[in-house]
Swiss-Prot record:
Record-linked CDD domains: HNHc
Gene: yajD
Family from the record: Belongs to the HNH nuclease family.
Protein name in UniProt: Putative HNH nuclease YajD
Disulfide bonds: none
Enzyme class, first EC level, given as a word: hydrolase
Keywords per UniProt: Hydrolase, Nuclease
Cross-referenced Pfam families: HNH
Cross-referenced InterPro entries: HNH, HNH_nuc
Taxonomic source organism: Salmonella typhimurium (strain LT2 / SGSC1412 / ATCC 700720)
EC number: 3.1.-.-
HNH domain span: 27-75
PANTHER family: HNH NUCLEASE YAJD-RELATED
Length: 115
């Protein structure tokens, strides 16, 4: 677990302000757009999870809405719990194949039987 510096609030406000100037106000995962009135719901995520790694070009930052940010961090919690690995920005669900069951496959035939 990373040690949180005493001046964390000041550091956070500094990189947040920079990130909001560098990037469009859009969640990097769900593409939700933000305006000034709901900007508090847009967070800065550190891609490498090191809150002290704040390069001026923003290469370690990603703007995420509250929900996507929570989801991103929950993946790491689950990985710790179950001993799996996580690749930043990727979901395990992407590896799952397409669904093969089609509930409407014979719908026309079923409807014709009732007539």
């Amino acid at each position: 677990m990373a040690i949180i510096p005493k001046n964390y609030a000041r550091l956070e406000s500094g990189y947040r302000e920079k990130a909001l100037k560098l990037f469009p106000w859009v969640c990097g995962r769900c593409s939700r757009e933000f305006v000034y009135s709901n900007l508090r719901e847009l967070t800065v995520h550190h891609i490498d999870h090191d809150h002290t790694n704040n390069p001026e070009d923003g290469s370690n930052w990603e703007l995420l809405c509250l929900y996507c940010h929570d989801h991103e961090h929950s993946k790491y919690t689950e990985a710790d719990q179950y001993g799996s690995t996580v690749i930043a920005g990727e979901d395990a669900q992407k590896d799952v194949g397409e669904a093969t069951y089609n509930p409407f496959a014979d719908l026309k035939a079923m409807m014709n039987k009732k007539k």
